Regions:
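Enzymes that bind and transform nitrogen-containing heteroaromatic metabolites
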Residues: 1-186
Length: 186
């Protein structure tokens, strides 16, 4: 059975973006890029919520024209060629999305996990991650904690989320002090 992997960047004060929604603070050094690329390579489908999707589709289709960062140059072609699913009740169709899930999220994700293939990779976004956590559908949590205090922004998980015990599966320090920790569903 395929796994659903959650891969997210957060600040040490637990925010996934800054007070004004900025996402200019993650430090994608060589080691962290390699970690991210390994997660992508074991996945054959990327999953996004609407908010993260809007940021991804605004950058990655033409990323090489906007940045010459090694991570960007390696990830952009992979992003373009990998099937993408967007969970949204407000988006009906998008040229870059393979599929849009508007209703029956639990049923559709459960069905995807049962299908043959590589893993599903959920990147960022607290709303969709919170809902999929509540539904018990996320198998692995990969959390990159960056050495920055943002002082506000969206929390890693929505306020009021149910308590959930996880099993520690490993941790490592990458590049300039980014700590990546993996937890598995207990």
């Amino acid at each position: 059975m395929r796994k659903l992997i959650f891969w997210v960047h957060t600040s040490i004060d637990g925010h996934i973006d800054g007070p004004a929604g900025e996402f200019d603070w993650p430090m994608m050094g060589e080691e962290l890029s390699a970690y991210s690329e390994a997660l992508c390579e074991r996945s054959d489908t990327f999953l996004y919520g609407r908010g993260v999707w809007e940021g991804m589709v605004a950058f990655w289709p033409n990323a090489e024209k906007m940045s010459d960062h090694p991570h960007v140059l390696k990830f952009a072609p992979l992003w373009r060629s990998t099937p993408k699913i967007v969970a949204s009740t407000t988006i009906e169709h998008d040229d870059w999305a393979t599929e849009v899930i508007g209703t029956d999220l639990a049923e559709r994700i459960t069905d995807l996990k049962r299908q043959p293939g590589a893993d599903l990779l959920l990147t960022g976004g607290s709303g969709l991650a919170g809902e999929l956590t509540r539904l018990g559908l996320i198998d692995e949590y990969h959390i990159a904690v960056h050495p920055v205090v943002l002082g506000g922004g969206r929390p890693l998980f929505p306020r009021g989320a149910d308590r959930l015990g996880l099993r520690f599966a490993g941790s490592r320090v990458c590049d300039e002090g980014v700590v990546v920790t993996r937890y598995d569903r207990a």
